[in-house]
């Protein structure tokens, strides 16, 4: 069974969201998603300063098995990306909830977080 930290919010498309304060949220992919994808070989991240809409594809994770779109779980402006992934994409596999984060978003509308799942609901969704 996948590790699903209870302090995070989740999208059905397997992204997690962590509140960093001041309306900024870190985003990554779940342990379940990285297990399905396999070993990461490249992560194409969004441009800092770009605006993204909830549900829009904004990054790509490429593994030995497949390339998979990563979707913005909330709308807002990309304020940071994890540059460590340029040389170490495997961090997405080894530490998906910590060092393997992908990007940070300054939320345009924090009420969109209400559309995301808590840990129990996400676990139920992936176990179906």
Curated annotation (Swiss-Prot):
InterPro entries: 2-oxoA_DH_lipoyl-BS, Biotin_lipoyl, GCV_H, GCV_H/Fam206, GCV_H_sub, Single_hybrid_motif. Binds 1 lipoyl cofactor covalently. GO terms for cellular component: cytosol; glycine cleavage complex. Its cofactor is (R)-lipoate. The modification N6-lipoyllysine is found at residue 65. Residues 24-106 form the Lipoyl-binding domain. Keywords: Lipoyl. It comes from the Bacteria. The keyword Calcium does not apply. One of its GO terms (biological process) is glycine decarboxylation via glycine cleavage system. Belongs to the GcvH family. PANTHER family: GLYCINE CLEAVAGE SYSTEM H PROTEIN, GLYCINE CLEAVAGE SYSTEM H PROTEIN-RELATED. HAMAP family: GcvH. The glycine cleavage system catalyzes the degradation of glycine. The H protein shuttles the methylamine group of glycine from the P protein to the T protein. The glycine cleavage system is composed of four proteins: P, T, L and H. This is Glycine cleavage system H protein. It comes from Yersinia pestis.
